[in-house]
Amino acid sequence: MYAIISVGNRQYKVTQDQEFLTEKTGKNAGESFDAKVLLFAESSNKVHIGQPELKTARVSLKVLEDVKGDKIHAYVYKRRKNYQKAWGHRQKLQKVKVVSLSAV
């Protein structure tokens, strides 16, 4: 059984007990929450397609820990103008586990 959920402007294909990284959701480590937007669910031989989302299916998630993504470096310069600028960025992420998945 799997489902396609939307968390933080991104879509994820998830299964039971799967762990994945998502953008920071505003929840603290150890807190549980439900995926608000469930787009697709498949169980045994039944397929449930949301138009645009499913109301009956439910996916419960638990935040395991807060992590940071890889460092991204950016650099800009303008030739012959003695202008250059460099900066970096690390995205704040959360490791999330699928606790329960039901497509009723």
From Swiss-Prot:
Cited function: This protein binds to 23S rRNA in the presence of protein L20.
**KW RNA-binding (keyword) present:** yes
Molecular function terms in GO for this entry? rRNA binding; structural constituent of ribosome
UniProt cross-references to InterPro entries, sorted A to Z: bL21-like, bL21-like_sf, Ribosomal_bL21
One Gene Ontology cellular component = ribosome
Which example biological process does GO assign this protein? Answer: translation
Organism field = Leptospira borgpetersenii serovar Hardjo-bovis (strain JB197)
Origin: domain of life: Bacteria
Family under the similarity heading: Belongs to the bacterial ribosomal protein bL21 family.
- Tell me how this protein assembles: Part of the 50S ribosomal subunit. Contacts protein L20.
Q: Which UniProt keywords apply?
A: Ribonucleoprotein, Ribosomal protein, RNA-binding, rRNA-binding
Output this protein's name: Large ribosomal subunit protein bL21
